[in-house]
A protein has these predicted regions:
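Membrane-helix interface "capping/anchor" motifs
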Residues: 74-85, 132-142, 181-194
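Membrane-helix boundary connector in multi-pass membrane proteins
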Residues: 107, 157-168, 175-192
């Protein structure tokens, strides 16, 4: 298995321990800041001229958080760092979001909703470890990339053949962006995009994303 992983994507170069710590600390702070922003926007209305951004609804959805986690994972220096950075991001996000909720908003968070995000935070290092290989080469990279693109496709589109359409334009942008950040070369990216179509249809018609709590 290690041979397959190393063949898919190799760790390039080493970074110093202080720099690694700073990167993880930044991920933690970034997550905390995003959590605070998300809750602030949930409780406060933006000026009317910014309504078109729809930031409150956007950050209340799952897709942007998964997209940030994917970016942190694939652009980390190693799969281990990917897991650490993504975990730090989600821990920071949860702390920021729920501290703001309980201290400044004056009420306690919904427990089932909190548990969903706690579970995602716990499993995120293992998922990020695998996602790091999506920017590698070969069948494994294509497979991981196609699943990721398929997930964003499910967020972006209504995949009912009788009513195919974009569901939410910001998530359509994230779908396009996911293709961009996972791009390796034209041939490999084309394979990933093609394979993502049946994967997305499978996810949609089995309801798997809803079952695992991210749909």
């Amino acid at each position: 298995m290690l041979k397959i992983l190393n063949k898919t994507r190799k760790v390039s170069g080493k970074i110093s321990v202080p720099k690694q710590i700073m990167t993880t600390f930044f991920a933690l702070l970034f997550g905390g800041g995003m959590g605070i922003v998300a809750k602030f926007l949930d409780l406060n209305r933006l000026p009317s001229f910014l309504d078109w951004l729809d930031l409150s609804n956007f950050l209340g959805r799952t897709a942007p958080w998964i997209f940030i986690a994917v970016c942190l994972a694939v652009f980390s220096k190693s799969p281990l760092k990917a897991g650490i950075n993504v975990f730090a991001f989600f821990v920071g996000m949860l702390i920021g979001y729920y501290v703001w909720t309980s201290v400044f908003a004056g009420f306690y968070p919904d427990i089932p909703y909190l548990m969903r995000w706690l579970i995602l935070a716990v499993v995120s290092p293992f998922l990020a470890f695998l996602i790091w290989y999506a920017r590698g080469r070969g069948a494994l990279a294509i497979g991981i990339s196609s699943v990721l693109i398929a997930i964003f496709c499910c967020f972006a589109f209504n995949l009912n053949f009788a009513d195919f359409r974009i569901l939410y334009f910001p998530e359509f942008i994230l779908w396009l962006a996911s293709i961009g950040i996972l791009f390796k070369d034209v041939k490999q990216s084309a394979f990933s995009l093609l394979i993502s179509i049946p994967v997305a249809l499978s996810l949609e018609y089995t309801g798997l994303l809803t079952i695992i709590g991210i749909g």
